[in-house]
Regions:
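The beta1-alpha1 cofactor-binding region of Rossmann-like NAD(H)/NADP(H)-dependent oxidoreductases
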Residues: 48-49, 70-82, 114, 239-240
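A conserved structural motif in NAD(P)-dependent oxidoreductases
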Residues: 230-241, 252
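Canonical Rossmann dinucleotide-binding motif of NAD(H)/NADP(H)-dependent dehydrogenases/reductases
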Residues: 9-42, 195
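Short C-terminal tail/terminal secondary-structure segment
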Residues: 2-8, 103-106, 167, 246, ...
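Short, small/polar-rich loop/turn modules that mediate ligand/substrate recognition or access, typified
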Residues: 200, 205, 256-258
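Substrate-binding pocket helix/loop in short-chain dehydrogenase/reductase
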Residues: 107-109, 113-118, 162, 226
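Catalytic loop of short-chain dehydrogenase/reductase
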Residues: 140, 149-187, 192-200
Length: 270
């Protein structure tokens, strides 16, 4: 039997990982997890001060190289500039995590304007397309293969239960899930499957992570109503999404592509 160091399969030392939406609630955890497993990390987000500060924090905490780059992923010129800058400062790109999220305020489907629809789709669809295209081209030119991971949502694979939003709020704002959010997150899964076969000969693997509801200052009413629908009986902690990312980013998943790992406490198993 071949002697395999199974722990080493998860080692990301020497790899460069790019994370969009890098200073968001999940983005920070994803960046930290990648850094802890040895990856050099590029934090991409639209918040200029936050990306630089968080990149410094990653370097101090984990001893890896980390840089912050301000980028609106829905802008073709900004995406091209960001990828060029990453290659200049970091060398090859081995991992892309398409994780930026556009989400408009909750609005009834009947009242949603085209402008509101496009605000979300510009990030969740066009942004994912632009980043995957630009980084995919770079990975092909490097001839080293690579791993692309894209964040979908539980509402990309099932309809939102409107009942759980009754009397619910988060950070003082009324909660709800818009149709465009569900529509775009479903499209992320389709893009993943397409690219997984399209780039298979280039040894670029493409997979999706689909998170369920993550605890983030929602009121107790929402937490209870959401948790009652979950077989495990609670909302997710943001840290619980990281294991799936490390698996998909690393050689531990070297024979996995085109897949969607659902981290939802069993919600879609009912």
């Amino acid at each position: 039997m071949k002697n395999v160091n199974y722990a080493k399969l998860f080692d990301l030392t020497g790899k460069t990982a790019v994370v969009t939406g890098g200073v968001g609630i999940l983005g920070k955890c994803f960046c930290s997890g990648l850094a802890e497993f040895g990856a050099n990390v590029v934090v991409l987000d639209i918040d200029e001060n936050a990306v630089f500060e968080f990149a410094k924090e990653l370097t101090t905490t984990y001893g890896v190289k980390a840089i912050g780059i301000t980028c609106d992923t829905s802008s073709p010129s900004e995406v091209r500039h960001a990828v060029k800058l990453i290659v200049k400062k970091m060398g090859a790109i081995h991992i892309l995590h398409n994780n930026a999220q556009g989400k408009t305020a909750s609005v009834n489907f009947e009242d949603c304007s085209l402008e509101q629809w496009r605000m979300t789709s510009s990030v969740n669809e066009e942004g994912y397309f632009l980043m995957a295209q630009a980084v995919g081209k770079q990975m092909i030119s490097q001839n080293l293969g690579g791993s692309i991971i894209q964040t979908s949502s539980i509402y990309g694979i099932m309809g939102a239960d409107q009942r759980i939003y009754k009397n619910s709020s988060s950070k003082g704002k009324t909660m709800g899930t818009s149709a465009v959010y569900s529509f775009t997150k479903s499209g992320v899964i389709g893009l993943t499957k397409y690219l997984a076969t399209y780039w298979a000969n280039n040894k670029i693997r493409v997979n999706t992570i689909t998170p369920g509801g993550v605890e983030d200052e929602q009121n107790e009413t929402f937490k209870k109503q959401y948790s009652n629908r979950i077989p495990l009986g609670r909302m997710a902690l943001k840290e619980e999404m990281v294991g799936a990312l490390i698996y998909l980013a690393s050689d531990a998943s070297s024979y996995v592509t085109g897949q969607n790992i659902i981290v939802d406490g069993g919600l879609d198993a009912w």
